[in-house]
């Protein structure tokens, strides 16, 4: 489990093609400080398992074909910047919300509206996740726990989030251009509520 509070921006330093998979090498000195083989690290909101911890704060992780296709990890190349977070420790503060590290879909940044102190980012989303997104609710965008500040009024095919300076500075979303594909994970509580309501008839 993760919290959506990004610990650092890492950098992809290598990508090796495997059979139906890829092995990524990522530099992240903070998240690798106490990491070992088998630990979980969220990369752009995708839970990956550490294969090896390398010198200079690097680690390797394998990404299967389904994940490469369903998330933006398939677009990563050496030099790409990524959001990194270690799995939450029992008893640690839950600064964001419960994040599983299982991407539900990808969205696309369609507009950025900066102001003096914050910036509103509009993201187009597929219908498969739209029903779980509510105004003032939580959503994970590339591993970042954010609050939905606006929704499309009619078709509900987009939502907006507001970025404070700290989020812009410490995450990749601060520099992501219009047209960038981002990973989306909706609040898992909404999924459970829907399942319970369906079961109740």
From Swiss-Prot:
<dbReference type="InterPro" id="IPR017938">
    <property type="entry name" value="Riboflavin_synthase-like_b-brl"/>
</dbReference>
<feature type="binding site">
    <location>
        <begin position="162"/>
        <end position="167"/>
    </location>
    <ligand>
        <name>2,4-dihydroxypteridine 1</name>
    </ligand>
</feature>
<dbReference type="GO" id="GO:0009231">
    <property type="term" value="P:riboflavin biosynthetic process"/>
</dbReference>
<dbReference type="InterPro" id="IPR001783">
    <property type="entry name" value="Lumazine-bd"/>
</dbReference>
<feature type="binding site" description="in other chain">
    <location>
        <position position="136"/>
    </location>
    <ligand>
        <name>2,4-dihydroxypteridine 2</name>
    </ligand>
</feature>
<feature type="binding site">
    <location>
        <begin position="101"/>
        <end position="103"/>
    </location>
    <ligand>
        <name>2,4-dihydroxypteridine 2</name>
    </ligand>
</feature>
<feature type="binding site">
    <location>
        <begin position="145"/>
        <end position="147"/>
    </location>
    <ligand>
        <name>2,4-dihydroxypteridine 1</name>
    </ligand>
</feature>
<protein>
    <recommendedName>
        <fullName>Riboflavin synthase</fullName>
        <ecNumber>2.5.1.9</ecNumber>
    </recommendedName>
</protein>
<keyword id="KW-0686">Riboflavin biosynthesis</keyword>
<keyword id="KW-0808">Transferase</keyword>
<feature type="binding site">
    <location>
        <begin position="62"/>
        <end position="67"/>
    </location>
    <ligand>
        <name>2,4-dihydroxypteridine 2</name>
    </ligand>
</feature>
<comment type="pathway">
    <text>Cofactor biosynthesis; riboflavin biosynthesis; riboflavin from 2-hydroxy-3-oxobutyl phosphate and 5-amino-6-(D-ribitylamino)uracil: step 2/2.</text>
</comment>
<dbReference type="GO" id="GO:0004746">
    <property type="term" value="F:riboflavin synthase activity"/>
</dbReference>
<comment type="function">
    <text>Catalyzes the dismutation of two molecules of 6,7-dimethyl-8-ribityllumazine, resulting in the formation of riboflavin and 5-amino-6-(D-ribitylamino)uracil.</text>
</comment>
<feature type="repeat" description="Lumazine-binding 1">
    <location>
        <begin position="1"/>
        <end position="97"/>
    </location>
</feature>
<keyword id="KW-0677">Repeat</keyword>
<dbReference type="InterPro" id="IPR023366">
    <property type="entry name" value="ATP_synth_asu-like_sf"/>
</dbReference>
<feature type="binding site">
    <location>
        <begin position="4"/>
        <end position="6"/>
    </location>
    <ligand>
        <name>2,4-dihydroxypteridine 1</name>
    </ligand>
</feature>
<dbReference type="Pfam" id="PF00677">
    <property type="entry name" value="Lum_binding"/>
</dbReference>
<comment type="subunit">
    <text>Homotrimer.</text>
</comment>
<feature type="binding site">
    <location>
        <begin position="47"/>
        <end position="49"/>
    </location>
    <ligand>
        <name>2,4-dihydroxypteridine 2</name>
    </ligand>
</feature>
<feature type="repeat" description="Lumazine-binding 2">
    <location>
        <begin position="98"/>
        <end position="197"/>
    </location>
</feature>
<dbReference type="InterPro" id="IPR026017">
    <property type="entry name" value="Lumazine-bd_dom"/>
</dbReference>
